[in-house]
A protein has these predicted regions:
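Membrane-embedded hairpin module used as a gating/binding unit in multi-pass transport
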Residues: 204-287
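N-terminal amphipathic/basic leader segments beginning at the initiator methionine
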Residues: 1-36
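Histidine-anchored nucleotide/phosphate-binding helix
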Residues: 68-87, 296-307
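Short glycine-rich or small-residue beta-strand-to-loop segments that form or flank ligand, phosphate
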Residues: 56-68, 93-100, 281-283
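Short internal beta-strands
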Residues: 89-99, 237, 312-318
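An acidic, phosphate/nucleotide-engaging active-site surface
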Residues: 103-173
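C-terminal catalytic subdomain
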Residues: 290-338
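Glycine-rich phosphate/diphosphate-binding loops that line cofactor/substrate pockets in enzymes
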Residues: 42-60, 86-89, 230, 271-277, ...
């Protein structure tokens, strides 16, 4: 719960099941695991061979709402590897993939990227509504106009980083989401996310856009189409175990390596419920997953799978950033779903 815990006591005979992630490996040496991944990548040449001296390299990182990824532990390794390939720090920049979220403070840049990286390379914030900072690169087959951050498009090579977990609309997080919505324009994001709605107004979410589902998922496929337009040269994504420790780091082709990581996620998170319960008490795992109610939606989604119809869900969310994102909070002013 936030940066701490909440304790509850329940009669043992009333507890149907305590659901945690399946047991999995824990990486003890994150630096060595990162080097192993980027030097023996999936579907790609090693990172040192993907870039060449003279390249301007942009690295996309997830924002503070995804700090569970622990980017600060593997990002310095990526930058050091680029140095070994002949790319100096002055030819590298980091772009924080806010999507529609607010900009970072300096302290949050340090928390996400590490103080070492914050002191070594330029860090920029993405603003989805800054039209002058965006470039149109095409329209997807589903009619989504792709506006992408100019800095990333101006880079010779783009590396995307992040973490993979279950996502209630896109099937899984990570991978292509670093580009869309990460560094996309607001118009692009709104059009893409609308694909998660059912065709009939008021019918709620599309059943094709659901946790763990990527085949036939229009939201996911639209994201992939936009990411392919940018065509990042490399990906590094983390997979975390139930305790929040690194279980695996995948690297390589922006789609193939990510897809391999989703299999690890299912091995850890694919826990079978014994039955549906009258009451489900759920936590997303504390900060930053409970930083606001919007991020908390991932808790409601998974908890709902274990809940009987008309049951009671108790979501444990600290929400220190309760007013973010503003567009989500503003939606509560409506008195109906139409």
């Amino acid at each position: 719960y936030g940066h701490g815990t909440q304790e509850i006591e329940l009669p043992e005979e009333k507890v149907l099941q305590v659901i945690n992630g399946n047991p999995s490996t824990k990486i003890e040496d994150v630096k060595q695991a990162t080097l192993e991944a980027i030097r023996n990548p999936i579907g790609s040449e090693p990172l040192q061979k993907v870039v060449v001296k003279g390249d301007k390299v942009g690295i996309v990182v997830s924002d503070i709402t995804r700090s569970w990824i622990r980017t600060n532990e593997f990002l310095p390794v990526i930058i050091d590897e680029l140095n070994l390939a002949g790319i100096p720090d002055e030819d590298i920049f980091v772009l924080v993939a806010q999507g529609t979220h607010r900009a970072h403070t300096r302290e949050e840049d340090i928390a996400v990227c590490s103080r070492e990286v914050a002191d070594r390379v330029r860090i920029y914030q993405h603003f989805s509504k800054d039209e002058e900072g965006l470039t149109y690169i095409g329209t997807t087959k589903r009619g989504t106009p792709a506006y992408i951050n100019k800095r990333i498009l101006d880079a010779d090579k783009v590396i995307i980083t992040g973490g993979i977990t279950i996502h209630l609309m896109a099937g899984f997080g990570g991978g292509r989401k670093s580009i869309m919505p990460g560094v996309a324009g607001d118009t692009t994001i709104q059009k893409n996310h609308a694909l998660a709605l059912a065709a009939d107004v008021g019918a709620g979410a599309s059943l094709e856009c659901a946790s763990t589902k990527i085949d036939g998922n229009p939201l996911h496929e639209d994201m992939c189409e936009i990411a392919a337009m940018v065509n990042p040269c490399f990906l590094v994504n983390s997979v975390m175990n139930a305790e929040g420790d690194f279980s695996r780091i995948v690297a390589g082709h922006w789609y193939d390596a990510w897809l391999e990581g989703t299999k690890d996620v299912m091995t850890i998170q694919g826990v079978e419920a014994k039955a549906k319960a009258d009451v489900v008490i759920a936590s997303p795992g504390g900060f930053p997953k409970d930083i606001n109610m919007y991020q908390g939606s991932k808790t409601y989604d998974t908890a709902g799978m274990a809940l009987k119809p008309n049951g009671i869900m108790i979501a444990m969310l600290d929400c220190p950033d309760i007013n973010e994102p503003q567009a989500f909070i503003d939606s509560f002013r409506f008195s109906d779903m139409l």
